Amino acid sequence: MKPVSRRTLDWIYSVLLLAIVLISWGCIIYASMVSARRQLRKKYPDKIFGTNENL
């Protein structure tokens, strides 16, 4: 197997770190949206959230 250069390894590690950060931020944003929707349902049980009202 051909040895990999240091520059290539740095690039691969950077891309992996960026992917991990983006996935974790996506999970945080999704969880906060779910939590906000639950709180709104508790406060306003007669309203429907997360749907288009024009339909």
UniProtKB/Swiss-Prot annotation:
GO CC annotations on file: membrane
- Tell me the protein's name: Small integral membrane protein 27
UniProt keyword annotation of Membrane present: yes
Query: Where's it found, cell-wise?
Result: Membrane
Topology term for the membrane: Single-pass membrane protein
- The encoding gene: SMIM27
Q: What parts of the sequence cross the membrane?
A: 11-31
- Going by the entry's taxonomy, the superkingdom of the source organism is recorded as Eukaryota
Give the originating organism: Homo sapiens
Going by the UniProt record, its keywords in alphabetical order are: Membrane, Transmembrane, Transmembrane helix
